[in-house]
A protein has these predicted regions:
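Bacterial Sec-dependent N-terminal signal peptides
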Residues: 1-33
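N-terminal accessory beta-strand-rich subdomains and adjacent acidic, glycine-rich linkers
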Residues: 28-269, 600-602
């Protein structure tokens, strides 16, 4: 263990808070440690070794502490050596950017004959993983990677639940009461929650933030979460039952670092992932989806309700419809094949729902046990392809253990053989699979609009929560929040209409499910209906214009020659949001504005202006929003 102590205390210092001097408390004296400095290609991020502690710094600002120790092995002093420079571009079918740049300096520390640590320093963060030449008896050595998040530092962290459907409340302390409804919560001897899910956002300084997560889960690996003891937050992988023998490496531990724009715009989670394993991806087409479940929880066993949602997709010019749970119990002598045929006859591509049958089984919706065995899965996916199903939504998993991770990979790979999209629900958050398996279009792992069906809690929390997600959950991958609730479900919403419409751009998901019922969309002005018909679900570029978690956010996304700019007010008070678009768009452009009517929240305001006439400030009503289309 001693070898790890020396090295990991070293790595701890480089990613740790830089030490005080005559400068401000959050600045580091780079002169004293320059000789031990590892850096990013643009030199903005540095990993600094001082006294066997590693510190992660953005420019001159200390960010967050990181420590590694207590691994099985012998002790020796380890030093990082430069290995190579990564500089490549890769394309994504989905996500915040079509062409991503994978640029980093890679370093390696050989800890023993059996173990090395690979560290990559990117322009927007760092990533590291452990690489073993062989495992002993198939046992993965215990990992105790730990981050130090000081009391008083602002943080937005989600208490762990196996569905990752929780809030990211702002706090400056780890002392938070466990949420009793979460499955898998844990508490310390003092009674505070001590288990946290990825991602975790921490504010290190006024303009410096760090987002902690992980990426590139492969077979023989489990996903991880954070357990804390006071200020120390340890990375703890879930059960890893069958790691096998031979070479093994951990997933990448990732820290995205910089300004809020650096965090929101980062593709670091997919940068470290394996390239696409699907060669022909022409059949993978992101799009907007009409969705039965939000308004009719048991509506997918009624062909007449399904037909209404197909007709809605036709009228709004949406490419997809989702037939949700219980389609195998279709009423009145009909079958799901009848529903699928109706959709395809109307040139709408249908997707259907499955229970994963590894999580909620007893009393859970059907169909169940169709996908667990390879031979059953092959039969089911072949049948889906034959009858004209475009994709599958698979629900109710049971945590982050290796069994679930392997199962998810099996599902993505086998679905791709039959040209089926995949959308995971009741599952873990994205960890970069969308690059390796481009048919993974979206993942739930979010407290979304579905919760208007379940509890009254969401009504008052939704606006602030919506203004937090772009800085936390949606940074790491697609998010099937299911926006656009213009009407009410079991519990009311108090966000404005423009707020709800803005979410369709603000939240990135390659399958953008629209929550509301057909009649609600038909009641909206023609401008809104037409917009939904040309709304993209994947983007060429993404830029954060401004914002702060939980308060407000404005994001611009590009598709072809259009920019879509969405902003929301997460507070209960009116807010003026500055709108400076000079860095993203210039010249003679036309702007369509979708706005709230400040005199009547039930009405819209629409304007079309030249770009040069665009107001410098958007006046938002409480929990309001706005949307611009620039062409």
């Amino acid at each position: 263990m001693k070898f790890f102590y020396s090295f990991f205390c070293s790595l701890f210092a480089c990613l740790c808070f830089c030490f005080p001097s005559l400068m401000s408390a959050n600045e580091v004296n780079l002169q004293n440690v320059f000789a031990n400095r590892l850096k990013s290609p643009n030199h903005k991020i540095s990993v600094i070794n001082e006294n066997n502690v590693f510190s992660l710094c953005y420019k001159k600002t200390k960010a967050i502490e990181l420590s590694f120790n207590n691994f099985n092995g012998t002790s020796q002093n380890a030093q990082f050596v430069f290995l190579r420079k990564l500089n490549e571009n890769y394309r994504m079918k989905t996500g915040k950017r079509a062409v991503c740049m994978n640029e980093a300096n890679e370093y390696k520390a050989q800890i023993s004959d059996n173990l090395a640590v690979v560290l990559r320093i990117y322009n927007d963060g760092i990533a590291f993983r452990y690489e073993y030449n062989h495992l002993s008896n198939g046992i993965v050595p215990q990992e105790t990677t730990a981050f130090k998040i000081l009391e008083g530092m602002k943080r937005w962290m989600q208490q762990w639940a196996d569905s990752y459907e929780g809030f990211f409340p702002i706090s400056d302390t780890y002392k938070q009461t466990p949420v009793p409804s979460y499955s898998g919560t844990s508490k310390s001897k003092d009674g505070w929650n001590n288990r946290w899910g990825f991602p975790a956002l921490v504010q290190a300084d006024e303009n410096v933030f760090a987002l902690i997560t992980e990426a590139n889960i492969e077979r023989r690996q489990s996903a991880a979460c954070l357990f804390n003891e006071g200020e120390i937050f340890r990375v703890v992988p879930d059960k890893n039952e069958k790691a096998g023998n031979g070479p093994w490496h951990s997933p990448w531990r990732v820290v995205i670092l910089g300004t809020l724009a650096d965090v929101v715009e980062s593709t670091l989670v997919t940068d470290v992932c394996e390239p696409a394993k699907i060669q022909n991806t022409d059949w993978i087409q992101p799009g907007v989806v009409s969705w039965v479940y939000w308004a009719y929880n048991h509506g997918s066993n009624d062909i007449n309700i399904i037909k209404r949602y197909v007709d809605m997709a036709v009228r709004l010019k949406l490419p997809y419809v989702l037939i949700d749970a219980e389609w195998d119990q279709m009423k009145d002598g009909f079958s799901v094949e009848d529903a699928v045929r109706y959709a395809n006859d109307n040139h709408i591509k249908p997707m259907i729902w499955y229970n994963s049958s590894v999580g909620w089984v007893d009393g859970a919706p059907t169909p169940k046990f169709k996908l667990n065995k390879p031979e059953d899965r092959e039969k089911e996916f072949a049948w889906c392809e034959k009858i004209g199903v475009a994709g599958v939504k698979i629900d109710f998993f049971s945590g982050d253990n290796q069994m679930n991770m392997d199962y998810c990979i099996d599902l993505m790979e086998d679905a791709a053989k039959h040209h089926l999209f995949v959308n995971f629900h009741g599952a873990t958050v994205p960890r970069g699979w969308q690059r390796t398996y481009p048919n993974l279009m979206s993942t739930e792992g979010v407290y979304g609009a579905e919760w208007y069906n379940n509890v009254p809690t969401f009504t008052k929390k939704a606006a602030a929560h919506n203004a937090t997600l772009p800085f936390t959950r949606n940074v790491i991958g697609p998010m099937d929040y299911t926006p656009c609730a213009f009407s009410d479900s079991q519990h009311p919403h108090i966000t404005s209409k423009a707020h709800e419409l803005a979410l369709t751009v603000l939240f990135e998901s390659a399958l953008q499910h629209l929550a509301d019922r057909p009649e609600s969309f038909y009641q909206q002005p023609v401008e809104v209906q037409q917009f939904l018909g040309y709304l993209p679900a994947a983007w060429d570029d993404t830029k954060l214009i401004n914002g702060y978690p939980g308060q407000f956010v404005t994001i611009a996304r590009k598709s072809d020659d259009k920019w879509f700019v969405a902003g929301i007010n997460g507070t209960d008070n009116p807010m003026d949001i500055k709108l400076d678009l000079k860095k993203i768009v210039k010249g003679k452009k036309t702007v369509k504005l979708f706005l709230d009517n400040p005199d009547n929240n039930e009405q819209w305001l629409f304007k079309t202006v030249e770009l040069k006439e665009l107001p410098a400030v958007m006046n938002c009503v409480p929990r309001g929003g706005f949307l611009l289309v620039i062409s």
